[in-house]
């Protein structure tokens, strides 16, 4: 019981206003461990309870450095460079999410590309499953991963409509993705003659 209480006391959360709306951020120490957009405080507590099995403690505001890094990331100033806690995930899930963090703003990749990049070329479906369990959407931008046929696919942070909104916010027109796929502009990880596909900016 003592260990449970200590864990509970170690997970805290607070809201931050962003260009996309109110974002709730949970953290352990200086590491972000869960985020959700457009929720309310009680709803976010339930999200954390599903992920960690506990409810976090609410703070009035995020630590200043953490809030600045979150806002810089969401406004495109710089990629989030703060600490992220993925310790509750499997090694495969962590590999997938770390690779996702390297996808630049305004670009997309396919599930197949991610699978190949982490050395599991036939595991595109498992990549999708790992992304569905992403506890830190936006900061780990799983919305930038789409199907090889140009369709958006699912999104753990609120479904395809939210995914489309996030891509549009970053300058990607979701309606163009199918056309771009027909021109091989969505990186799939498949090899062409003479070398590998290179990821190409969508814009």
Residue spans of the language-model regions?
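Basic nucleic-acid-binding alpha-helical/helix-turn surface characteristic of O6-alkylguanine DNA
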Residues: 1-122, 169-203
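Short glycine/serine-rich loop segments
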Residues: 122-164, 174
């Amino acid at each position: 019981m003592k260990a449970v209480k200590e864990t509970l006391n170690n997970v805290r959360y607070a809201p931050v206003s962003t260009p996309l709306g109110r974002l709730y951020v949970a953290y352990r120490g200086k590491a972000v461990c869960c985020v959700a957009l457009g929720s309310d405080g009680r709803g976010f507590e339930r999200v954390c309870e599903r992920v960690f099995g506990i409810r976090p403690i609410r703070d009035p505001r995020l630590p200043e450095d953490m809030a600045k890094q979150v806002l810089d990331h969401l406004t495109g100033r710089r990629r989030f460079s703060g600490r992220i806690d993925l310790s509750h995930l499997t090694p495969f899930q962590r590999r997938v999410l770390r690779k996702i963090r390297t996808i630049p703003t305004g670009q997309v990749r396919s599930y197949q590309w991610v699978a190949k990049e982490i050395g599991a070329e036939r595991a595109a479906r498992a990549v999708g499953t790992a992304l569905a369990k992403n506890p830190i959407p936006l900061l780990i931008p799983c919305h930038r991963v789409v199907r090889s046929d140009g369709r958006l696919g699912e999104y753990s942070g609120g479904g395809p409509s939210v995914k489309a909104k996030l891509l549009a916010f970053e300058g990607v027109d979701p309606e163009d993705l199918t056309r771009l796929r027909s021109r091989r502009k969505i990186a799939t990880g498949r090899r062409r003659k003479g070398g590998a596909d290179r990821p190409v900016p969508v814009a």
